[in-house]
Amino acid sequence: MIYGVGIDIINIKRVEHILSKNKQSFVKRVLSEHEQALFANKGDSAAYCAKRFAAKEAFAKALGTGIGKIISFQDLTVRNNENGKPNFFLSEKLRLYLVNKNIKQAHLSLSDEKFNTVAFVILETED
């Protein structure tokens, strides 16, 4: 059964602008340690950050909490499997919160084109 659906879209140029002004603070606030390590080697760093930002915002919308009180950007890490499919890896705090809500699965789809990145998340319960 679907618990929630979230979608987020962000303009990559907006992220480029933010990175040009406040790269360190933005990267530290939005990206997990794992993502920060990969970010250092990315050629298109704005697109990489935009995808992670949009994915985390969409997750928070699907959960119905937004980013802030219940979860932070640091509670979510987006990693791609060997085929390139993006998946969420959760902090222990967030994992326990989802268990309490009976949420068993998070589905993530990311897409981008020249100017925008979009993320779509579905959270499922077992019921």
UniProtKB/Swiss-Prot annotation:
The keyword Lipid biosynthesis applies. It holds the Pfam family ACPS. GO terms for molecular function: holo-[acyl-carrier-protein] synthase activity; magnesium ion binding. It catalyses: apo-[ACP] + CoA = holo-[ACP] + adenosine 3',5'-bisphosphate + H(+). NCBIfam families: acpS, pantethn_trn. This is Holo-[acyl-carrier-protein] synthase. The lineage of its organism: Bacteria, Pseudomonadati, Pseudomonadota, Gammaproteobacteria, Candidatus Pseudothioglobaceae. It is found in: Cytoplasm. Belongs to the P-Pant transferase superfamily. AcpS family. One of its GO terms (biological process) is fatty acid biosynthetic process. InterPro entries: 4-PPantetheinyl_Trfase_dom, 4-PPantetheinyl_Trfase_dom_sf, ACPS, Ppantetheine-prot_Trfase_dom. SUPFAM superfamilies: 4'-phosphopantetheinyl transferase. GO terms for cellular component: cytoplasm. It comes from Ruthia magnifica subsp. Calyptogena magnifica. It is an enzyme of class 2 (transferase). Its main location: cytoplasm. Mg(2+) binds at D8, E57.
